[in-house]
């Protein structure tokens, strides 16, 4: 069934340079990221309009003007900078789908919920953990922030900030490998190993 699979279905992660969107909240859970009433949708696309729905809209579905995503100056931002323990709560992957579909490709926070962190890499989103003081500084960054994944560095107008990521997770994003592609790569390596490790027959 997968004989013709190309091995790449996510977009390869390239350098990103945009202004940041500051979300000054801690313990943002997955139900706040995308409310449960929208989980019946099964396609990954289309969730962007439901991102932070209860914060973006009032009971009449009018935009709340005091919410950061409704500020026009952040409309083209691809970088969300937020508080600790982002993505906590239930393990719904829809939360990452909503962030990615809205346009966020990088999330910067002091810490993430473990399952949310893993789900980011499955969907082409880069989660970056930095010290809280640095995160607070980036929330108030007036210029553009550049994300250079290959060299693992963030660049502001005045400084370069290194960040950590595992070599495997880095490869997943740089090559745009989804879970199926990762599995096929592993199968190829296992087959190659078995081919060169056959036990000789015993006479």
Model-derived segments and spans:
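N-terminal, positively charged, Ser/Thr/Ala/Gly-biased leader segments
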Residues: 2-38, 175-203
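A generic structural signal for short, non-catalytic loop/turn and secondary-structure boundary residues
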Residues: 13-16, 44, 140, 156-158
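Pocket-edge structural micro-motifs
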Residues: 24, 83, 158
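Short, acidic Gly/Pro/Ser/Thr-rich loop/turn segments
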Residues: 28-30, 41, 154, 170
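Feature captures the catalytic cores and cofactor-binding loops of soluble hydro-lyases/lyases
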Residues: 34, 41-142, 149
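Acidic, glycine-rich flexible loop/linker segments
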Residues: 124-202
């Amino acid at each position: 069934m997968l004989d013709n699979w190309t091995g790449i279905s996510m977009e390869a992660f390239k350098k990103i340079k945009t202004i940041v969107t500051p979300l000054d909240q801690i313990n943002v859970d997955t139900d706040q990221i995308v409310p449960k009433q929208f989980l019946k949708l099964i396609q990954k696309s289309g969730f962007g309009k439901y991102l932070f729905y209860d914060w973006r809209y009032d009971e009449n579905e009018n935009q709340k003007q005091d919410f950061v995503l409704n500020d026009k100056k952040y409309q083209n931002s691809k970088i969300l900078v937020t508080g600790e323990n982002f993505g906590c709560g239930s393990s719904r992957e829809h939360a990452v789908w909503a962030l990615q579909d809205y346009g966020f490709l990088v999330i910067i926070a002091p810490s993430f919920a473990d399952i949310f962190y893993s789900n980011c890499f499955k969907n082409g989103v880069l989660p970056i953990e930095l010290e809280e003081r640095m995160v607070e500084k980036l929330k108030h960054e007036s210029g553009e922030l550049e994300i250079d994944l290959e060299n693992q560095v963030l660049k502001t107008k005045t400084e370069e900030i290194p960040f950590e990521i595992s070599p495997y997770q880095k490869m997943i994003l740089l090559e745009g490998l989804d879970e199926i592609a990762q599995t096929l790569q592993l199968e190829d390596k296992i087959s190659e190993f078995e081919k060169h490790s056959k036990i000789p027959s015993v006479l």
